[in-house]
Amino acid sequence: MINWLVLNAVILIVAYLLGATPSGYWIGSWFYGVDIREQGSGSTGATNVLRTLGNVPALVVLVIDIFKGALAIALVRYIYSLVFAQNLTIIAGVTDIDTAKEWMVIIAGLIAIVGHTKSIWIGFKGGKSVASSLGILLAISWVVGLGTLSVFIVVLTISRIVSLSSIIAAISVSGLMFFTGQPLPYQIFAITGGIYVIWRHISNIERLLACKEPRIGQKLSTEQKMNK
């Protein structure tokens, strides 16, 4: 039992460190001499990088953040495919390895999301976990991941507001998980992860309600920065 718990703890620590990789901060700092945390919304995610540094660095950050989310899930599945991990699971008294793996997948996914928003490398600050959540969804179920991305793109095309698109996409995940018949752990991830991502957008929701949320190409006003 102890060995199995230690193994899972190590997996979750690595998942957190993957999620905590502050790609937006590092790219801004290393290549542009800019602390992205002190610019725009203060987020280290691709949207703030886009507003602050431009298209290319934003695209790089987006790809890295999607990849690190997917990698956290791939790590769990790889470890649980190894014979020694399966033996430890059985010795611990867990006979249904597939179900154990599914629960570990969602726990690792949630921890990676938290890592993105609360990165140990930059004073427990970070982004809003939209891109990393997409990577996790694509790794869990590519159908749900692409469905969520489609919702995001449609709303973004109509509204040109990234935060609104992210919020509606986060809401849609639960329905997509349910209607595609995903396992219960994945449906729980959709609900808890969606709530967390929406909570990270509280300041955006306040600006949306006040009709002050910037669209693509616009930057936050001084007043909005003070209230971010």
Curated annotation (Swiss-Prot):
Localized where? Cell inner membrane
Q: Which Gene Ontology terms describe the biological processes this protein takes part in?
A: phospholipid biosynthetic process
Q: Name one Pfam family in it.
A: G3P_acyltransf
**Membrane association type:** Multi-pass membrane protein
One GO CC term, this protein? plasma membrane
EC number in record: 2.3.1.275
Q: Provide the reaction this enzyme catalyses.
A: an acyl phosphate + sn-glycerol 3-phosphate = a 1-acyl-sn-glycero-3-phosphate + phosphate
Q: In which pathway does it act?
A: Lipid metabolism; phospholipid metabolism
Q: Which UniProt keywords apply?
A: Cell inner membrane, Cell membrane, Lipid biosynthesis, Lipid metabolism, Membrane, Phospholipid biosynthesis, Phospholipid metabolism, Transferase, Transmembrane, Transmembrane helix
Which InterPro entries does this UniProt record tie to the protein? G3P_acylTferase_PlsY
UniProt superkingdom: Bacteria
* Main subcellular location: membrane
- TM stretches of this protein: 1-21, 56-76, 104-124, 136-156, 161-181, 183-203
The record's GO molecular-function terms, alphabetically, read: acyl-phosphate glycerol-3-phosphate acyltransferase activity
NCBIfam families documented for this protein: glycerol-3-phosphate 1-O-acyltransferase PlsY
Function per UniProt: Catalyzes the transfer of an acyl group from acyl-phosphate (acyl-PO(4)) to glycerol-3-phosphate (G3P) to form lysophosphatidic acid (LPA). This enzyme utilizes acyl-phosphate as fatty acyl donor, but not acyl-CoA or acyl-ACP.
Q: Which family does it belong to?
A: Belongs to the PlsY family.
Q: How does it assemble?
A: Probably interacts with PlsX.
Protein name (database record): Glycerol-3-phosphate acyltransferase
